[in-house]
Amino acid sequence: NVRLLTTEPVCVPVWGTQLTTPHVSDKYASVRLRTEVANAGNKHIRVVTEIISPDGKVVAAKDNTRKINHGQPFEQNFLVDAPALWSPETPRLYKASSKIYADGRLVDEYTTRFGIRSIEIVADKGFFLNGKHRKFQGVCNHHDLGPLGAAVNVAALRRQLTLLKDMGCDAIRTSHNMPAPELVELCDEMGFMMMIEPFDEWDIAKCDNGYHRYFDEWAERDMVNMLRHYRNNPSVEIGRAHV
């Protein structure tokens, strides 16, 4: 899909928010929101943010005003009591809804969907989700949909994921390009852990018309775009460069 967004000069750019959860427990979670604001130099920027729970209630809020230096994100920190943790069994999703004011005038609104969860990979011990050791029960899932072709079809993707869920699958490795946002959003909602990748060749060819032709020019940009695009999606656990 291609979308043309029209904004005020002072705005949140595409992929302009980063949400992290530095502390996660059953009692409370800390949520850190960093918001990029374009063209904000020498202006008083006010950001009003509400954290909305999976059942639609406002569970935390902040209203802050400050001047932002060029390239510096606007940071806000929240505490969420008794958080609903994201996992494949409980894919609960929160929203951070922000209103951006410049010199007292509303110029942009931006909503980021996210999950509260912790992940950790420990040498010789493995992967931990929300403090609990876990093994991936996963598949490698190519982007095409059989006779339907490669164009995104949300209903077909949902059917595919439902069948995988029914057989006990809880993880998906995509291949071999940046996955469609519709797939990642469905994995957020339905409870799949993901390992995503931007390309399947480096500068050594596997075929005549492969990614190696574009690696030097595009590899870093594609990797950065993939990580920025999906850094707030709770289903995305690992980003990798295929070898």
Q: What are the functions of these language-model segments?
A:
Residues 121-125, 180-184, 214-228:
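Alpha-helical scaffolding within the catalytic cores
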Residues 142-147, 201-207:
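Conserved radical SAM core fold
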Residues 223-240:
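Active-site groove signature of glycoside hydrolases
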Residues 178-180, 200-203:
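Solvent-exposed loop/turn segments at secondary-structure junctions
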Residues 1-186, 190-194, 237-238:
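Secreted/periplasmic carbohydrate-active enzymes, especially glycoside hydrolases
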